[in-house]
Amino acid sequence: KGRSFLSNSGSLLRVRPFRFLFHIRIYVMFKLIRQSVLSTLCLAVLLCAAYPMLVTGAADAFFPKEAAGSLILRDGAIVGSALIGQPFSSAKYFHPRPSAAGYNAGSSSGSNYGPTSKALAERVRASEQELRAERPEGVLPVDMLTASGSGLDPHISPDAALMQVRRVAEARGLPPEAVEKLVRGHVEGPEWGVWGEPKVNVLRLNLALDELR
């Protein structure tokens, strides 16, 4: 009693060859199943509990605002996130870049148009006609003609914001110089001073615009 099947050599000698192979296969199969179950349980605990708790705890400790979603408050109420763009269509506000998802965070996506798509060409052409009302001549900002891959881009280029200064100033009855100064004050540099290009957060800019007198 207590001896394994493999160590019981006396019994094995009395078993027919095919029965011996059958028992060997059963033993190996259960051994592999046991290893697989233990590996699955260990990885589940590690990846589904320990790692998420570690990352969440570190984020809350070192980046509490970002971990909470980079939420923007106005009078104690949440008005949006600095990471998620919002649609603005009024002439009194700066407009974001086109979005194939309508800035719906629940259906984040791009247009999936190919470079030879006629629908893409028509959409870009329509955007160009609208933008020419603000910049009749010269090069238009490419970010105002193309949609982002996520459809939720919260930023536009400084050039795209400056192009809209005249319209916003006229709609609000403000001096263009004051609006332009506001835009330049909201230009964010590259991440960590290295990655990306200068940009303007549209939601932050429009909130500051409401406070401009």
Model feature map: region roles:
Residues 5-8, 12, 28:
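Intrinsically disordered and other compositionally biased segments
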Residues 2-3, 10, 17-18:
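Intrinsically disordered, low-complexity segments enriched in serine/proline and basic residues
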Residues 17-28:
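Short, Lys/Arg-enriched N-terminal segments with co-localized hydrophobic residues
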Residues 167-213:
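Extracytoplasmic/periplasmic C-terminal soluble domains
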Residues 27-28, 39, 48, 53-171, ...:
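Flexible, solvent-exposed loop/hinge segments and secondary-structure transition points
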